[in-house]
């Protein structure tokens, strides 16, 4: 492998913003934000909206998503004109 062309693979903290769940793993993603982890060290912080801690498939909770407004808007926009 060529040196200097590959991204740095390091430990980062992912924060699920919807459930406030944090987990430490390794990634090549960059972030300007950092967070102090349980071991006392600072790691880059990557914020995500959805993870296994909040996704309905993994949690078993069913969440109703209100799409009625979008469907009605679509139907009005593309309804046949008689």
UniProtKB/Swiss-Prot annotation:
Q: Which UniProt keywords apply?
A: Ribonucleoprotein, Ribosomal protein
Which family is this sequence assigned to? Answer: Belongs to the bacterial ribosomal protein bL31 family. Type B subfamily.
Record's subunit section: Part of the 50S ribosomal subunit.
InterPro entries with a match to the protein in the record: Ribosomal_bL28/bL31-like_sf, Ribosomal_bL31, Ribosomal_bL31_B, Ribosomal_bL31_sf
Can you name a GO cellular component term? Answer: ribosome
* Record protein name field: Large ribosomal subunit protein bL31B
This entry's Gene Ontology molecular function terms read:
structural constituent of ribosome
Q: Does the keyword Ribonucleoprotein apply?
A: yes
GO biological process entries: translation
């Amino acid at each position: 492998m060529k040196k200097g062309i590959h991204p740095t693979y390091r430990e980062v903290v992912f924060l699920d913003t919807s459930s406030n769940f944090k987990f430490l793993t390794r990634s090549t993603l960059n972030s300007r934000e950092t967070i102090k982890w349980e071991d006392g060290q600072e790691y880059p912080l990557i914020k995500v909206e959805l993870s296994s801690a909040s996704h309905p498939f993994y949690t078993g909770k069913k969440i109703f998503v209100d799409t009625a407004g979008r469907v009605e808007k679509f139907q009005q926009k593309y309804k046949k004109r008689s």
